[in-house]
């Protein structure tokens, strides 16, 4: 099986699992503290949703966003996650998984392999 396709499948599975986790968070717990000093549950969700946006942007060859600005969860983190998840899945389906790009942290990467990390 093609490693790059496996990477894309892995990312898609992980994104859907993240959605399932968010779906289990009670409405009154979004402002609860987490083990990340100074971060609420909503802050952590926003960070992960922003990362999802960047993964989509990689698939489309677009510039990365500031995934740490705290805005990605919006007023309804689950709805925001689902909207971004749909965008990510759509982008992956048409992506060139063999495309090479430069990650500021990991250096030169192949998109499909990167998705499998």
Enumerate the language-model features and the residues they cover.
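Aromatic-glycine hotspot motif
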Residues: 1-117
């Amino acid at each position: 099986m093609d490693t790059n396709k496996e990477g894309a499948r892995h990312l898609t599975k992980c994104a859907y699992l993240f959605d399932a986790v968010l779906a289990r968070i009670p409405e009154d717990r979004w402002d609860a503290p987490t083990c990340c000093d100074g971060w609420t549950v909503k802050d952590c969700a926003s960070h992960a949703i922003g990362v999802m946006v960047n993964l989509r942007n990689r698939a489309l060859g677009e510039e990365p966003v500031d995934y740490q600005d705290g805005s990605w969860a919006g007023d309804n983190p689950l709805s925001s996650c689902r909207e971004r998840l749909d965008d990510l899945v759509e982008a992956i389906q048409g992506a060139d998984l063999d495309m090479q790009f430069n990650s500021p942290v990991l250096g030169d990467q192949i998109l499909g392999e990167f998705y499998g990390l």
